[in-house]
A protein has these predicted regions:
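Conserved ABC ATPase signature
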Residues: 160-165, 169, 458-462, 466
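Conserved signature/switch motifs of ABC ATPase nucleotide-binding domains
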Residues: 99, 163, 180-181, 460, ...
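ABC ATPase "signature
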Residues: 243-247, 255, 540-544
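Conserved ABC ATPase "signature" region
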Residues: 137-156, 381-382, 436-453
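Charged, flexible cofactor/metal-binding loops and thiol motifs
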Residues: 77-83, 249-307, 320-325, 546-623
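A short, proline-enriched helix->beta-strand linker immediately N-terminal to the Walker B motif
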Residues: 180-184, 477-481, 497
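ABC ATPase NBD Q-loop/coupling interface
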Residues: 69-96, 134, 205, 374-396, ...
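ABC ATPase C-loop
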Residues: 173, 178-179, 470, 476
């Protein structure tokens, strides 16, 4: 008889609250076979992460296991399966399992790693706690595991702090910490949600490789069906604390039965959606958008050309090599970026983390001063240099160009009510009376599909999707022409993401807004954008209408980005072998005529109407 590594039966988890007990997980049952990957799928709040916490017995104090069993059959010994649900959460038995035989990769590596200790100390500590080794042996093992998970300089990683690492390297450090003890079960809770698409593909490939080497079982918690299609052997779908469908990956993707799973699949943005086709969220948001522009906004003159244009923007940052050395090095974050945003259209700006996307948006907002280049804004009276604006003109520009932030949890002041959040921009710009502002706040809530009775609530009482709608409402308060959207849906699960994307489209159609939409998710950008600019290492490397770009990508970096997107179609798997060999983000490794070396910017050249690609200067001269 083949006993599963982990067998959960009739698990219930209860939370205490002021109004009584709440059952977050109800009668959950599933198995994790030895050496296999099981994906636990569902929206935020479905009980996925709480289940993982119960397996490790790290539930919050207000929660308890209300019933059921969690049987763990450790292949390292001949003992009968151990029921984790009956163990003392503070006892020696669970402490030996936790981080030793059962390890976990958490969703946000920056908050999971201590900022006060080097990653070398944190990774080696796991082995010191669970293995009979000396400090020197633990550090040697840490170097080995850093090399295995892809650190470019494993020895230097020993003395590196988390804040010195990119998001991808932080997640690799978390994987190293989990794997150094060679666990039998690895629980990965949304391990790639915060990562860009190429880094995500690398992390997924790394997890597959390491799982095969160690014959480890993987419990993958995610809401990304593209990741599930490329990683899972078995899938368990949760909704409101219960399993609604479970089975082999191929059965669920080809023959989904439950309406919830079918709805989850319809909410995922897909490439080549038909013009005008909408995402189908699990729960529709009814908003009252039409006829909400004021008379003053309707009377504004419209620009004849681009509403916003950037030309040859450059920005560099000087970093110190150490506190006392005095040595510095210059980082070129943005190199000759030129963009044009048409009225009522969406320009998608895509690329990996650190490529300069957010720096460009900050310069457009005048939060950063460029080293060179210009940004012009046309409010209907002709283009004006944004960096020359002062006084009332600058205030008018800030009113016309608003920002929607990435993180809906940290971008709203927790000490302000919804009414105060929505009316603060009106108060700062001295718009309307107190009664006018109150009416405007109610209108804004209705526009984003929230009840006007929420005005006296605080941000903590809202879900992530509701908070992001509040962020959009705040950005709309001053009736802007342009919204700069910096990864506005990356922190949201797929069904809430569909609500926000549909809302942004509806607002644009009704209010004539222009969007600069910054994202690393190409499927999302394909859904919402009209034109797409691809950015790498501070350069715009390709720009085209979205249909052209996805049908005929020319630049090798664009091709690599598209190849790294996990598709929720099991007939279109990721080519992990090709992704591993590509040096797609290094301009010096690009083939001719795209290669950029020695600080060369190259030049954008048009290869068909509206389709531009960056090539070397020599190639451009030959073409001329």
């Amino acid at each position: 008889m083949n006993v599963p590594l982990l067998s959960i039966r009739d698990l219930s988890i209860d939370f205490k609250s002021d109004v009584g007990a709440f059952r977050a997980v109800d009668g959950l049952s599933f198995d994790v076979p030895k050496g296999k990957t099981v994906a636990l799928v569902g929206e935020s709040g479905s009980g996925k992460s709480v289940t993982a916490q119960a397996i490790l017995r790290i539930l919050p104090k207000v929660a308890r296991i209300g019933g059921g069993s969690i049987l763990f059959d450790d292949p390292a010994n001949d003992e009968p399966p151990l029921d984790i649900a009956t163990l003392d959460p503070e006892g020696e038995t669970i402490r030996a399992l936790r981080g030793g035989r059962i390890a976990m990769i958490f969703q946000e590596p920056m908050t999971s790693l201590s900022p006060l200790h080097t990653v070398g100390d944190q990774v080696s500590e796991a082995l010191l706690l669970h293995g009979d080794v000396s400090k020197a042996e633990a550090l040697d093992s840490a170097v080995d595991v850093f090399a295995r998970v892809g650190f470019p300089d494993p020895k230097r990683a020993l003395v590196t702090y988390p804040f010195e690492l990119s998001g991808g390297l932080r997640q690799r450090a978390m994987i190293a910490m989990a794997l150094i003890t060679r666990p039998a079960l690895l629980i990965a809770d949304e391990p790639t949600t915060a990562l860009d698409v190429t880094t995500q593909a690398q992390i997924l490939d790394l997890m597959r490789e390491l799982q095969g080497e160690a014959q480890m079982s993987l419990l993958l918690i995610t809401h990304d069906l593209g990741v599930v299609a490329n990683m899972a052997d078995h899938v368990v779908v949760m909704y409101r604390g219960r399993v609604v469908e479970a089975g082999p990956r191929e059965d669920l993707f080809r023959r989904a039965q439950h309406p919830y799973l079918k709805a989850l699949m319809r909410a995922v943005p897909r490439f080549a959606m038909a013009p005008g086709e909408r995402l189908t969220p699990i729960r529709e948001v009814k908003s009252a958008i039409l006829a909400r522009r004021t008379e003053a906004a309707q009377a504004r003159p419209e620009p004849k050309g681009p509403v916003l244009a950037a030309a040859d923007l450059c920005k560099s940052f000087t970093l110190r090599a150490g506190w006392f050395s005095g040595r510095t090095r210059k980082i070129h974050a943005v190199n000759g970026v030129s963009l044009q945003l048409a009225r009522g259209k969406t320009l998608g700006l895509v690329g990996e983390s650190g490529c300069g996307k957010t720096t460009v948006s900050k310069m457009i907002m005048r939060a950063l001063q460029p080293d060179s280049g210009t940004v012009t804004f046309d409010d209907g009276a002709g283009p004006r240099d944004v960096f020359a604006l002062e006084g009332d003109d600058l205030k008018a520009y800030r009113r016309a160009v608003q920002f929607v932030f990435q993180d809906p949890f940290s971008s709203l002041n927790p000490r302000m009510t919804v009414y105060e959040i929505l009316t603060e921009p009106l108060r700062i710009h001295e718009i309307g009376t107190s009664d006018d502002r109150f009416e405007r706040a109610k209108q804004l809530l209705e526009m984003v599909g929230l009840d006007r009775r929420y005005l006296r609530r605080y941000p903590h009482s809202f879900s992530g999707g509701q908070r992001q709608r509040l962020g959009i409402a705040r950005a709309l308060a001053l009736e802007p022409r342009v919204l700069l959207c910096d990864e506005p849906v990356s922190a949201l699960d797929v069904s809430v993401q569909a609500q926000i994307l549909n809302l942004l489209k509806d607002l644009q159609s009704a209010l004539g807004l222009s969007y600069l939409f910054v994202s690393h998710n190409l499927a999302v950008v394909d859904y919402i954008a009209d034109t797409i600019a691809v950015m790498c290492r501070g350069y715009i490397v390709e720009e085209a209408p979205k249909v052209t770009l996805f049908r005929n990508p020319v630049h090798p970096y664009t091709q690599a980005l598209l190849a790294a997107v996990p598709d929720p179609d099991i007939d279109r798997p990721l080519d992990f072998a090709k992704l591993k060999t590509d040096r797609f983000s290094d301009p010096a490794q690009w083939p001719e005529p795209f290669r950029l070396v020695g600080g060369e910017f190259g030049a954008m050249t048009e290869i068909e109407s509206g389709h531009r690609v960056r090539v070397t200067r020599a190639t451009e001269r030959e073409a001329a």
